[in-house]
């Protein structure tokens, strides 16, 4: 998912 990548930064 796209959010998966964003959460990876967190």
From Swiss-Prot:
Any single GO CC term annotated in Swiss-Prot or TrEMBL for this entry: extracellular region
Entry's localization field: Secreted
In-chain residues carrying the UniProt-annotated modification Methionine amide: 10
This protein's record includes keyword Thylakoid: no
Gene Ontology biological-process annotations: neuropeptide signaling pathway
Primary location recorded for the protein, binned into one broad class: secreted
Source organism superkingdom: Eukaryota
Keywords: Amidation, Neuropeptide, Secreted
Claim: Secreted is one of the keywords in the record: yes
The family this protein is said to belong to: Belongs to the tachykinin family.
Purpose: Tachykinins are active peptides which excite neurons, evoke behavioral responses, are potent vasodilators and secretagogues, and contract (directly or indirectly) many smooth muscles.
Protein name listed in UniProt: Scyliorhinin-1
Species in which this protein is naturally found: Scyliorhinus canicula
């Amino acid at each position: 998912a796209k959010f998966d990548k964003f959460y990876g930064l967190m």
